[in-house]
Amino acid sequence: VRAAETEAREKARQRLARLLDSLRLEPSHPAPCPYLPGRESRLLLLRPRELTPGSYHLLMDLNFRRLGWGVYRPACDGCTECHQLRLDVEAFRPSRSQRRCRRHNSDVIATFGRPDPTEEKHTAYRRYLEARHDGEMTGSWDEFADFLHEAPPFAREVVYRVERRLVGAGIVDVEPEAMSAVYFYFDPDLAARSPGTFNVLWLLDECRRRGIPWLYLGYHVVGGRGMDYKTRFRPHQILGPDGVWR
């Protein structure tokens, strides 16, 4: 049954790819690249009237990511370095350092529910951006509430705490065949806990509990700032320019 579903999804993906090509959409104006210093980025932006789990999965397999109610894909001049990376949930085996990270965070309590912007989370988000210098993001309340928390019905928020202290929080999209990590931020004072690694480990466990076969971690960019941790989760697949996962 799963093989037939995969074949049907691939045919639908190809039809969608042909449709997008036929529209000849214009990318956005150039802006500083958030991943590679000294380069410019351009994005192909779409705002579907209705974004459903099935349609979004097809778009992810065409190298699109979601932000708010829209989806985007890099369309940079002379650069094709941004490729989706995903993990095979059942095949994944944690490394020694990842097992150590899990033990180090055994006191962390996670809650999973609808996205809920609060002042406490916004403070952590703003401090995270200040510590990480995350591209062109400003840390404003409007940015935090609109782009992260204004989301389709299949979006969820995972919040991590130790006792009452907020460790970090992330937005994820949950579909029958895939979970996608949209954005994660954490208290920079707790960076020694490796919250980003722990978040991925927790999401992998949540995928197993739900029977979801794939976890999408967003774009991998060779040499990109803050990207190396993604390839430490193995085995992983990277979406090639030809649309094939390898």
Over which residues does each language-model region extend?
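Conserved acetyl-CoA-binding loop-helix of GNAT-fold acetyltransferases
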Residues: 192-204
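A conserved beta-strand-loop-helix scaffold within acyl/acetyltransferase catalytic domains
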Residues: 67-78, 84-192, 232
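Residue-level preference for non-acidic, small/hydrophobic
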Residues: 59, 125, 200-203, 230
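Conserved donor-binding loop and adjoining core beta-sheet/short helix segment
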Residues: 2-65, 69-91, 162, 169-188
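Hydrophobic pocket-lining residues that define ligand/cofactor binding sites across diverse proteins
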Residues: 207
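Active-site/acyl-donor-binding loops of N-acyltransferases
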Residues: 74, 83-90, 214-246
